[in-house]
């Protein structure tokens, strides 16, 4: 994993992270490297408290089909991504559910996600 962190930094690319039951180790690596590139937690399903801990450390959180509603509600717009990964759902279905959970219009959330993609993956 540390080699991937080095590559992310060397090439100026965000790091997409699949982490299961290793949050403390992940946070230790982040503290060790103090990366300049964005770290995106793929398929986040944790509790709001875990989300807040990660957000304070600068993570972006990406949500798929399964997540606690309260967690989705705690993530600020500028740190949010949506994904389908291995889901049978279309991204539009995930977008609609997330908008409902967050209490926003679908188009507003679509624009938020588009802006985040632009800022993280296509910044100059």
In which residue ranges do the predicted regions lie?
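Positions that flank functional sites
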Residues: 22-23, 69, 114
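Active-site metal-binding loops of divalent metal-dependent hydrolases
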Residues: 19, 43, 59, 65-67, ...
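Divalent metal-binding pocket/active-site signature
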Residues: 1-57, 103-104
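Histidine/acidic-residue-rich catalytic or RNA/ligand-binding cores of hydrolases
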Residues: 26-28, 51, 72, 90-96
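Short amphipathic alpha-helices and their capping/turn segments at secondary-structure boundaries
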Residues: 69-77
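Acidic, glycine-centered active-site loop in nucleotide-sugar glycosyltransferases
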Residues: 34-35, 76-78
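Mid-to-C-terminal alpha-helical segments outside catalytic/metal-binding sites
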Residues: 6-11, 95-124
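Short acidic/histidine-rich active-site segments
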Residues: 78-90
């Amino acid at each position: 994993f540390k080699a991937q962190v080095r590559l992310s930094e060397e090439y100026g690319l965000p790091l997409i992270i699949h982490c299961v039951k290793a949050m403390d180790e992940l946070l230790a690596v982040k503290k060790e490297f103090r990366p300049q590139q964005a770290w995106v937690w793929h398929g986040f399903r944790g509790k709001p408290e875990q989300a807040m801990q990660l957000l304070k450390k600068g993570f972006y959180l990406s949500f798929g089909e399964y997540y606690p509603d309260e967690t989705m509600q705690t993530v600020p717009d500028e740190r949010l991504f949506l994904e389908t990964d291995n889901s049978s759902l279309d991204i539009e279905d995930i977008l609609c559910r997330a908008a409902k959970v967050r209490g926003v219009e679908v188009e507003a959330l679509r624009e938020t996600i588009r802006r985040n993609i632009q800022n993280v993956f296509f910044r100059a």
